[in-house]
């Protein structure tokens, strides 16, 4: 659900003792055997058992393709122990053809969501879709861009910044996308949602035009009273997953099934020579004023006898460097930081938002440190969450990773 490509390879009992290979409703046949593929099918794009050693190349190539293609996500390959020990001739292995969509769609190990995504190819006429958006933009008085994590996932950050600069309208950021623009950015207009801030919600709820880029608008973004979300707005949403455009919690006036990078490339061309209307500037000033007038950290919070977590986050982020990476656990660790953080240009802020499972903080910080080639990482964890993977402190110590850990004792 967080659109992160991942490949999982698990070990399994030998094929002869796999219960799934027999038409008998057994709970278990092999020693410590479990039909893991059935367990994970609903949470993966592709989950399969490698039944033939000669298909290892094809299955691996297919898994890698699906993990990265379209909306990224996890794939799972379960390998029986007799397959693990099998001899193969690399020259005789079958390869996967990513262009043979017909054969790919016949694979029963694809999830329904993956099949839907492949069947509904990106056929939206982007030129006509963009013309309609620009037409509605010209009619609007209070336009807003709602940016989500899909901006970075699609590799569109630079072109996104170019497009939004040309449009010159307020930008609000969705959960796990707050680091797209820093707090001092001239178009920053807050963070909407049930765990957002007042300014961000005011920006969206008073808008009459909303362009959603790379956000699936989950319930925490639109609230449980989703019928009232952006109630005055004409809404256009760009998403690579067609199912996200048809959710019962959304009413989108102009759904666009497209790759965000392709959409933005065309949009920036259409915006050449565009002049920002005065009324759009006026609404941007109003939104910026709301950000100033409705801070997350109120003056009375500082009077608390014990440390208020919002005050702590306010002070912590004021002391961080512009190139720091911040990784949080869930609960108070992420809610207070994602609301109160005054993000500086160049900082990155991460959490696991879809399932929001406890225990993410330490392993997430380790992953962020490795992926950023050893940048300093600030890890914010709850005292319950950190216990779930506390053994990873040894990994941090063993590799001398520059990770600073703050634990909320609540």
Per-segment meaning from a language model:
Residues 76-78, 148, 280-283, 329-330:
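Short coil/turn segments at secondary-structure boundaries
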Residues 148-153, 301, 382-384:
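Conserved short loop/turn motifs at secondary-structure junctions
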Residues 288-363, 368-369:
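Active-site diphosphate/adenylate-binding microenvironment
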Residues 1-274, 319-322, 402-405:
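N-terminal alpha/beta PP-like core and its mobile active-site loop of ThDP/TPP-dependent enzymes
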Residues 1-21, 198-218, 332-410:
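Thiamine diphosphate
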Residues 56, 277-292:
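Internal, active-site/partner-interface "lid" segment
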